[in-house]
UniProtKB/Swiss-Prot annotation:
Localization (cell): Mitochondrion matrix; Nucleus; Cytoplasm
Protein name per the record: tRNA (guanine(37)-N(1))-methyltransferase
Subunit structure: Monomer.
Compositionally biased intervals (Basic and acidic residues): 267-284
HAMAP family documented for this protein: TRM5
Source species: Yarrowia lipolytica (strain CLIB 122 / E 150) (Yeast)
The organelle targeting sequence, given as a residue range: 1-53
Function: Specifically methylates the N1 position of guanosine-37 in various cytoplasmic and mitochondrial tRNAs. Methylation is not dependent on the nature of the nucleoside 5' of the target nucleoside. This is the first step in the biosynthesis of wybutosine (yW), a modified base adjacent to the anticodon of tRNAs and required for accurate decoding.
């Protein structure tokens, strides 16, 4: 294989598009001109004129055959159709973009010498007319990362800050300080290149430890952070600038809701099977209505706008949901109504520790005023299928604490949980507590093992509840990598009886 350098790149002389030739074509993908002095977007500076070969077929029937049998010879640039209409309403095919069209020799001969044998054969048979045209690739042609590589002072494309998360119509960036001079340009390009995006914002401060919100700067688009987000089959409406929402946690939301629903479904199936057996044994014309089954109660301590609570309510889980942020609480109540789960999700606006300490009392008060609820799925039941109403239970099966920066520091509030209401016995089932938390390590340190991480997290738990947990009885689920030296986990454990029945404590 012989190579020569053309426009700074090696080019195979082979007439057949081999693996090396295809590698070359990937290398010689057109790129916008460098504009490293630009800090304000000027869309006119990104036009590139590309010389292309156009093969006009007198008989259009050859076009489909040529495209099918000679794919390596046709143009394969995104958003450019290789079939073109000519001035006389005929049809022509653009040939691959890496053909060398420079030099004084005849264009047709030069092109034919670079095509595959089958391509040359078909073009000759069809008596195709080959000419050279100029195609302008303007700003609209380039992807966002190509524009950024053209403008930003980077040497590698993996350094480009092109990643963002979507929350409704808002693109959320977290730009490093080095891109401050380019932030408006970056925002405008993201707005231009993503049709779903109407607003681009950048995080300008660290997350507020009280409400988990952060200050944001609108870089491009509408100054509107009122969004609608769809997740887990639910609709969520909120002001992204005033509440906490992380789209990267949707898998974790689904995981825990599925866990809760799985346990509840198992219990409900057993109840329905028992009722079916009783009906069969009695053989009466009138079906025996099954006894009510206790609902599964979930306590969401840091509920936000409802990503755990609302999907849980849609699956007939009974949820007592709380958030301290008044804007989150307002959005939570709105989303509960929006998704028609008001019977299953009750909302509160309290401090997390105060809410945990009052949670059993709040549950008891609710079950006294509304002891029974109808399942959400009743409307979908089959004809003849018995209606299984649900009783509000006297205890929670699960507590969710999704405040990873400090949730562990709230665990002390579980002390004396079962001493706050009357009527509980030592046999009352204990809840499972699911605590989200961060674990980080210093620069220069090796990433800790799973065992080391769990030990460190359980030591933090011990300092709050004064009871050592058996590592083998504690689940630890890796949620996501927050930064190179920081991971997010969810640790799950059954609340020890010594904690639930301990004297209640108060911290100022």
């Amino acid at each position: 294989m012989k190579f020569n350098f053309w426009k700074g790149l090696w080019k195979p002389k082979s007439l057949t598009p081999t693996l090396s030739h295809r590698l070359y074509r990937r290398m010689y993908t057109p790129q916008p001109p460098l504009n490293r002095e630009m800090t304000v977007l000027d869309r006119s500076k990104f036009t590139v004129s590309l010389n292309l070969a156009l093969a006009k077929f007198p008989d259009p029937k050859y076009i489909a055959q040529f495209a099918k049998e000679c794919k390596a010879d046709i143009l394969q640039l995104r958003s450019i159709n290789h079939v073109q209409k000519t001035d006389d309403n005929g049809r022509a095919v653009l040939l691959r973009h890496d053909l060398d069209l420079e030099g004084g020799e005849d264009v047709a001969s030069k092109v034919m010498s670079q095509l595959s044998p089958r391509g040359k054969e078909l073009l000759t048979e069809a008596q195709a007319d080959i000419t050279k045209i100029v195609k302008d690739l303007d700003y609209d042609f380039w992807r966002a990362d190509e524009i950024f590589y053209s403008v930003l002072p980077v040497t590698e494309k993996d350094e480009i800050p092109s990643g963002f998360s979507m929350v409704g119509h808002v693109a959320h960036l977290n730009l490093r300080s080095e891109w401050k001079d380019y932030d408006r340009l970056i925002g405008q390009v993201i707005l231009d290149k993503n049709p779903r995006v109407k607003t681009v914002v950048n995080k300008v401060d660290s997350i507020d430890t009280k409400f988990r919100t952060f200050k944001m700067d609108v870089l491009a688009g509408e100054d509107n952070t009122e969004v609608e987000q769809h997740e887990s089959g639910c609709r969520f409406q909120f002001d992204f600038a005033k509440v906490y929402w992380n789209s990267r946690l949707h898998t974790e939301h689904d995981r825990l809701v599925s866990l809760f629903r799985g346990e509840a479904s198992s219990r409900e199936r057993k109840q329905q099977e028992r009722a079916k057996r009783e009906n069969h044994e009695k053989s009466t014309e009138t079906a025996v209505e099954p006894d009510n089954t206790p609902a599964t109660a979930v306590c969401d301590v840091f509920a936000g706008v409802g990503p755990f609570a609302v999907p849980s309510g849609r699956t007939s889980l009974f949820v007592m949901a709380n958030d301290l942020n008044p804007y989150s609480y307002e959005a939570l109540e709105h989303n509960v109504k929006l998704n028609k789960v008001s019977e299953y999700v009750k909302c509160f606006n309290l401090d997390g520790a105060e809410y945990v300490q009052q949670s059993m009392k709040l549950l008891d008060e609710h079950r006294r005023t509304q002891p029974t609820i109808n399942p959400v799925q009743v409307r979908k039941r089959k004809a003849g299928q018995p209606v299984v109403k649900q009783d509000i239970p006297n205890h929670y099966s699960h507590y969710v604490m999704n405040l990873p920066d400090s949730a562990i520091e709230f665990l002390w509030s579980f002390k004396g949980l079962y001493t706050t209401v009357d009527g509980l016995s030592q046999d009352t089932p204990l809840p499972h507590v699911h605590v989200h938390c961060f674990h980080k390590w210093e620069a220069g340190e090796e990433e800790p093992s799973k065992e080391e991480t769990k030990a460190a997290l359980l030591e933090r738990v011990y300092k709050q509840i004064d009871v050592r947990l058996d590592p083998n009885e504690v689940g630890m689920h890796w949620v996501r990598k927050v930064s190179p030296k920081k991971d997010m986990f969810c640790i799950s454990f059954e609340l020890p009886k010594e904690v639930a029945w301990a004297p209640q404590v108060n911290k100022e």
